[in-house]
């Protein structure tokens, strides 16, 4: 089984997570849509978004600060995020800030088959809260991914399931973000429908 390397910037890892499965509390969902959020991304005023989060005491700041957060998943705004490699923020005494990836869409997998249950799990038209809380049953925050020390296993496991060729992975602007970056990635719908 291929290991997922979380020591990559969000814009690369977000594409690689497409086709992987999230296993949690006995449920399995294939990731179909992701959004990358680089730590050093600038907002409309030209400030780093991580700086804005800290100055506004944003909840996302604590779970994205420090190299020890790489490979951690967390629920923020009712949605599942994954912290990955970022860099040093110059604004706050060279503090390490992680990039993060939002899991915006997923499809249920049962008995190694993709199940067409997209209405509640297509987060553009559905409610992202449904996947995290109702379907996967994630209630706590800052969960390590794929942790196994012999006695303790993590609550959330992300594993290799399918790989998609670059021509089957599309990109566009992120939802509710006012810049031109195409950091939203998704598997071509026609490609998924062939598997159902």
What do these predicted regions represent?
Residues 1-196:
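Conserved, well-structured core segments that form or line functional sites
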């Amino acid at each position: 089984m291929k290991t997922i390397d979380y020591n990559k910037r969000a814009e690369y890892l977000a594409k690689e997570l497409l086709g992987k499965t999230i296993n949690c509390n006995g449920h399995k969902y294939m990731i179909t849509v992701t959004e990358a959020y680089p730590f050093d991304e600038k907002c409309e005023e030209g400030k780093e978004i991580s700086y804005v989060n800290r100055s506004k005491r944003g909840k996302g700041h604590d779970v994205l600060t420090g190299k020890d957060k790489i490979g951690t998943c967390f629920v923020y705004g009712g949605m599942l995020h994954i912290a990955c490699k970022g860099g040093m923020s110059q604004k706050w005494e060279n503090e390490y800030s992680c990039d993060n990836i939002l899991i915006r869409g997923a499809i249920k997998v049962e008995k190694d088959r993709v199940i067409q249950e997209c209405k509640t799990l297509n987060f553009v038209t559905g409610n992202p809260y449904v996947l995290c809380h109702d379907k996967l049953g994630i209630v706590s925050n800052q969960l390590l991914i794929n942790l196994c020390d012999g006695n303790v296993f993590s609550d959330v496991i992300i594993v290799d399931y399918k790989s998609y060729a670059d021509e089957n992975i599309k990109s566009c602007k992120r939802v509710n973000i006012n810049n031109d970056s195409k950091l939203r990635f998704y598997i071509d719908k026609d490609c998924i429908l062939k598997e159902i």
